Amino acid sequence: MDETLKDLAAHVTGALPGAVVAHKIAYGELTLETTPDHILKLATFLRDDPSCLFTCIVDVCGADYPAREQRFEVVYHLLSLKQNARVRVKLSAGEETLVPSVTGIWPGANWFEREAYDLYGILFTGHPELRRLLTDYGFDGHPLRKDFPLTGFVEVRYDDELKRVVYEPVRLAQEFRNFDFLSPWEGVEYILPGDEKASSQPGAPAAPKAS
C-alpha cells in the first residue's frame, strides 16, 4: 500500500509543480499539503485524473493552532472508489485568509465548509451560501477556537413569562472546581445488599458490622 501511495504522491507532485508544498504517508494514508492559491487546481486534478479519481469528499474540517502565524488548518478528506485509496489534503490559513470553496468541484463540501466557518470562522470565498450551520442566529464568536471561553458569552433559555427564547449573559451558579486528576481513584467501601459473600474474597473491603 505504501508503495502505491508513494507512486501517487510522485504522480501528483510531478503533474502539478508547486501545488504540493509537502507530503507524507502515515497509517496507510497519503497527506498532501498545499496553499489556498493552489487548492482548486489540486482538487480538480485529484478528482479528474485517471490515476486519482477522488470523486468522493468525505469531510472538510478545521483545526486551530493559535501559536502559528497561520492559525488554522483546513483539512480535506477524499476517497477514490476506483483506486480504493484515501488522501488527505491540508492547507494553512489565517483569520482573514480567503480559502477558495471546493463546492464547485465536490458539491458535498457545502455543509462541511459551512461547519468550518461556523465553528472556526474560516472564510471560504465562492461558497454559494456561507452562513452558520450549527450555532444559533446571532451567535457571538466561533466555539471551536482555542481562545473561545468554555462557558461561552451568553446562555439561552425559555422565558415562561415572555413565552419565547431569551439570551442573557452567562451567570455561573457556582465557581469552577479544580480537580486533582493525578490522585489515584478510590472506590466505595460499602457492601451492597446481597454482596456479603464478596467480603471473603482477597482484597475485598470488610462487610459492615451490624449495629
Swiss-Prot record:
Where is this protein found?
Cell inner membrane
According to the UniProt entry, what is the EC number of this protein? 7.1.1.-
> Could you tell me what this protein does?
NDH-1 shuttles electrons from NADH, via FMN and iron-sulfur (Fe-S) centers, to quinones in the respiratory chain. The immediate electron acceptor for the enzyme in this species is believed to be ubiquinone. Couples the redox reaction to proton translocation (for every two electrons transferred, four hydrogen ions are translocated across the cytoplasmic membrane), and thus conserves the redox energy in a proton gradient.
User: Which Gene3D superfamilies does this entry report, sorted A to Z?
Assistant: NADH:ubiquinone oxidoreductase, 30kDa subunit (3.30.460.80)
Q: Which PANTHER family match?
A: NADH DEHYDROGENASE [UBIQUINONE] IRON-SULFUR PROTEIN 3, MITOCHONDRIAL (PTHR10884:SF14), NADH DEHYDROGENASE UBIQUINONE IRON-SULFUR PROTEIN 3 (PTHR10884)
Q: Which reaction does it catalyse?
A: a quinone + NADH + 5 H(+)(in) = a quinol + NAD(+) + 4 H(+)(out)
Organism whose genome encodes this protein: Azorhizobium caulinodans (strain ATCC 43989 / DSM 5975 / JCM 20966 / LMG 6465 / NBRC 14845 / NCIMB 13405 / ORS 571)
Q: Which domain of life is it from?
A: Bacteria
Q: What class of enzyme is it?
A: translocase
Q: Would you identify the family this protein belongs to, as annotated?
A: Belongs to the complex I 30 kDa subunit family.
Q: A cellular component term (GO) from this record?
A: plasma membrane
Q: Short name of one Pfam family for this protein?
A: Complex1_30kDa
**Keywords of this entry:** Cell inner membrane, Cell membrane, Membrane, NAD, Quinone, Translocase, Transport, Ubiquinone
Q: Which gene encodes it?
A: nuoC
Assembly, per entry: NDH-1 is composed of 14 different subunits. Subunits NuoB, C, D, E, F, and G constitute the peripheral sector of the complex.
UniProt name for this protein: NADH-quinone oxidoreductase subunit C
| Disulphide bridges | none
- Enumerate the GO terms in the molecular function aspect: NADH dehydrogenase (ubiquinone) activity; NADH:ubiquinone reductase (non-electrogenic) activity; quinone binding
Under the heading InterPro entries, the entry gives: NADH_DH_suC, NADH_quin_OxRdtase_su_C/D-like, NADH_UbQ_OxRdtase_30kDa_su, NADH_UbQ_OxRdtase_CS
This protein's membrane topology, according to the annotation, is:
Peripheral membrane protein
